[in-house]
């Protein structure tokens, strides 16, 4: 009697980088769908038409070689770079267990943000043994030709973990703010952060080119 062989599965991290174009992600996903690969995680970013796509898949060992071969041919056809990394079951479960960690949002804003500004902020994060999950630009694109007197730059850093010393982190961020001449906001990422709320700054037009109190009075019909 023939014994049924148990199908083994494995995780593969697929990394795609290169010039972005319409349909690129769809082309990659069509190959994964062809082999019924399970998507465990996915992330994509596009900076100045340069794509960075990461997909963590789980597929059976009989198909993994075919998946990588087809993806490699498709990447060559599209003119992008592709790489593969095996992820063990232990590594994957360790990553899953991290989802219970606390999350914080650090927002920094200034008239412009330099590499030195961002370095100062990320050093504070590193000193607290926290990880950066993502960085997102919140403000619009800045022209290098047209002069705009009302230029602002703001980025949001999504952090994972618990600060070693929250009070010290706040103090270090305050010191950074004074030395770098930028403003910051640090808050725990939970349901209360996403609730609608009103924040009013009375800053004598330092950052906001109007008087907030006067504008609120107009809205209230005062």
Short names for language-model regions:
Residues 1-196:
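A conserved regulatory-domain signal marking ACT and ACT-like small-molecule sensing domains
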Residues 195-198, 207-222:
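Active-site neighborhood of HAD-like aspartate-dependent phosphohydrolases
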